[in-house]
Amino acid sequence: MIVKTLLFLFLSITPKEKIDTLYHKIDPYSISKQLAFYELYPDTDIGKKALQRALDLVNIHRPLSDQIDCKVKIPPFNPNLIISLSSQLPKKGMENISEEELLTIKKMASHLHNRRLKGFYVQNLEDAKTIETDQIDLTRFLLLELVEDPKLRLFYEATVDLMALEILAHLPKGATLEEKLEKISSYVFHDMEYRFPPQSIWVEEIDSYTLLPTILDSRFGVCLGVSTLYLALAQRLDLPLVPITPPGHIFVRFEHKDAVINIETTARGIHLPDSHYLSVQTKSLKRRTLREVIGLNFMNQGALYWQQNNHKKAVEAYTIAEKYMGEDPLLMRFKGLQHLFLGEQEIAKNIFEKIRNVTLEGSTYKDTQIDDLMLNNIDADGIKLLYEKEGNQRSDIEKQIKLLENKLTKFPKFRDGIFHLAGAWLALNRTKEAFEVLLKYHVIDSQNPVVEYYLAALALDRLTLQSGKVHLKKAQELLKQQSYTPNVLKDLYLAYKKEDPTFDF
């Protein structure tokens, strides 16, 4: 009887009631979902209500003198575009969106904060050169460098604009900076589910997932890619953020009054303290400008070409990066190496002379790679070994060990090669071999606190405490000269103290 009653009630629901029920299930604060509903039911009262609701959400944050009137003709949106923006499904490239639709999005987004930046109105790279760093529009500059088709550039800009409007619609008028931060993270990491690409993809093409168009098309991104998107959205919402670059990584930081929040873009935006990124090798974190973030995108593009052994294209990418980063030591090292691999020794030498023995900002020890190259302690093929893809299988690591050992037989003073060989032995849990290899480094160069720390740690593991204490004291002495005592060094000292209560620095 109950089943028959329910069936009767279901069959008695009118089409209008079904549409009403469907409408009340969608997010009342989502512009894109309201517009998508309107696109499906444009001739119904509830469809027109959805359009009005979408416009109301936009108008909340627009000045009264510039409200969008529902009576003004709004061209219908491409449903595929709206659905892709309001779901977790990756886009499969540019949709067939019309110029009229792009102009509509542009009108809806005209109140976003990035419209106050001079950089938003730049139309070519020549004009971009004159824009001050604090006036750069990150999205516009990146797309001018990356995308030749003007309409495609407009499409990607419109995509970011719609994302910003979605976030803004969920914020009250006069929202605090903290509220904006929370909503951007919620939207990027939970609603849209931007995440690190699957291993099957990133192993082959990891550096392509730094570029904004790829991020927008795929919903996948590595640290730089998602951080770039986060910064682009923050510019539209008037949320000041600072890009921070630990070695080989980037995240964004929110600083306001006494609040300091790190947004770790590879871990759904959670806060990790600075200490998480510091080590024996890294004593401080480098702050970057938005101009440098553009350059970092092209550093990663250069790495992609390098990975493909296309050294000429890598030089081109690094040259673009140089426009935005100047003669950044790490950038210049990578660019110089490409010239070296192309057989352009004189160009490479001129670059290397500028960065020889440089200590990267935040690092506890100078770069030895270029110094050894110029001392003929290694050749170009030996340098290449350090940058080849490293497999995780045991056979891959054993192959790497054999190649490094063969190269070090000919070039026994190549410090980076020795350090990499020790790391390979450690990957196989062969601490004895790793310790013996690092001792060779110590004989050549006893001023590297990182090597001294690892020697001390390995000595403790092998319970050769006397020799380990020598290296631990050496590491402490070298770091004390830099007024730096990392937590891992303190922990290692306490571990020695546990084995020998009489031990002290």
Segments (PLM) and residue ranges:
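Sec-dependent signal peptide recognition
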Residues: M1-F8
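A structural boundary/capping signal
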Residues: I13-F505
